[in-house]
From Swiss-Prot:
Belongs to the glycosyl hydrolase 11 (cellulase G) family. GO terms for molecular function: endo-1,4-beta-xylanase activity. Residues 1-27 form the signal peptide. Pathway: Glycan degradation; xylan degradation. It comes from Rhizopus oryzae. Endo-1,4-beta-xylanase involved in the hydrolysis of xylan, a major structural heterogeneous polysaccharide found in plant biomass representing the second most abundant polysaccharide in the biosphere, after cellulose. The keyword Ligase does not apply. It catalyses: Endohydrolysis of (1->4)-beta-D-xylosidic linkages in xylans. Glycans are attached at residue 87. This is Endo-1,4-beta-xylanase 2. Residues 28-216 form the GH11 domain.
């Protein structure tokens, strides 16, 4: 079922072809788009299955509603990631497979990463190699690695590693100390490269649900 996550990387291949609009009036977004809104980078991608509607709100707030979706990714954050402390709060209400996670990419090496805070019915760790644990922000996280072979990425079709930290005590609000995860991954030989974008991401796959998240 790790292929669930691989479906989402198509978003990253597609975004290189998008124009990046500036500040936008509040409106429902239903097709692939990246840009800035109220000082935050945002990204939305869907494969077109089912019904998915994304809305940017004030500052770092966004909401997304989906029904019988194919697959989608959505969220707000920063155009350039870093080892920052990320605050998030709100509601995450999936019926089926969905993730709420800090999500980003690096280059040299090319890495796709997740710090997963909450998820629906499916824990993707069951399909990946367990590497260790890290304790951060009030919970143990299990660390996993997985190789994606000839899959879409931010640089086109490529082979690259995914790194994951999956929180045992799921939550929809709190602070993510990303440095704790990046350092733990590095100690396990899972090094990152130069940061590309970094968002608090709501993803869904063949599911329904809603989320309203504020990022800072």
């Amino acid at each position: 079922m790790v292929s669930f996550s691989s479906l989402f990387v198509a978003a990253c291949a597609a975004v290189t072809a998008f124009a990046l609009p500036n500040e936008l009036e509040k409106r429902a977004i239903t097709s692939n788009e990246q840009g800035t809104n109220n000082g935050y980078f945002y990204s939305f991608w869907t494969n077109g299955g089912g019904s998915v509607s994304y809305n940017n709100g004030a500052a770092g707030q966004y909401s997304v509603n989906w029904k019988d979706c194919g697959s989608f990714t959505s969220g707000k954050g920063w155009a350039t990631g870093s080892a920052r402390n990320i605050n998030f709060s709100g509601s995450f209400n999936p019926s089926g497979n969905a993730y709420l996670a800090v999500y980003g990419w690096t280059t040299s090496p090319l890495v796709e990463y997740y710090i997963m805070e909450n998820y629906g019915e499916y824990n993707p760790g069951s399909s990946m190699a367990h590497k260790g644990t890290v304790t951060s922000d009030g919970s143990v996280y299990d660390i996993y690695a997985h190789q994606q072979v000839n899959q879409p990425s931010i640089v086109g079709t490529a082979t690259f590693n995914q790194y994951w930290s999956i929180r045992r005590n799921k939550r929809s609000s709190g602070t993510v100390t990303t440095a704790n995860h990046f350092n733990a991954w590095s100690r396990l030989g899972m090094g990152l490269g130069s940061h590309n974008y970094q968002i608090v991401n709501t993803e869904g796959y063949q599911s329904s649900g809603s989320a309203s998240i504020t990022v800072s």
